[in-house]
From Swiss-Prot:
InterPro entries: Mediator_Med10 (IPR019145). Component of the Mediator complex, a coactivator involved in the regulated transcription of nearly all RNA polymerase II-dependent genes. Mediator functions as a bridge to convey information from gene-specific regulatory proteins to the basal RNA polymerase II transcription machinery. Mediator is recruited to promoters by direct interactions with regulatory proteins and serves as a scaffold for the assembly of a functional preinitiation complex with RNA polymerase II and the general transcription factors. The lineage of its organism: Eukaryota, Metazoa, Ecdysozoa, Arthropoda, Hexapoda. GO terms for cellular component: mediator complex. Keywords: Activator, Nucleus, Transcription, Transcription regulation. Belongs to the Mediator complex subunit 10 family. Component of the Mediator complex. Coiled coil: none annotated. GO terms for molecular function: transcription coregulator activity. GO terms for biological process: regulation of transcription by RNA polymerase II. This is Mediator of RNA polymerase II transcription subunit 10.
Amino acid sequence: MASPLENLENHLEMFIENVRQIRIIVSDFQPQGQNVLNQKIQSLVTGLQEIDKLKNQVDVNVPLEVFDYIDQGRNPQLYTKDCIDKALTKNEEVKGKIDSYRKFKSNLMKELDETFPTEIAKYKAIRGDE
């Protein structure tokens, strides 16, 4: 038996196919095709009702930005790529800050060791840095 997500995906694919077929019928509409169009529209409504029933079985959170990408005609998969790129950039910034703090600590300890050797020796002994 298909998982709820797979079931929803199948219904969405059928819905999209149904919309595509309706578009074809409407783009070259002939009066004798009215019954077929009515059937397709009814099947579209039924498909939406089925999708509505399935929505409670699937818990998927889609960031609103993904819909912005779609509205702009961009590939929604680019959202993931952009998020990864932003995370890498932020990671590099944080790594730079960490490295700066380590250098600062090292220089501070060196200066303090020269200025207050006894106190720094006690500090290092307490911390176990010897």
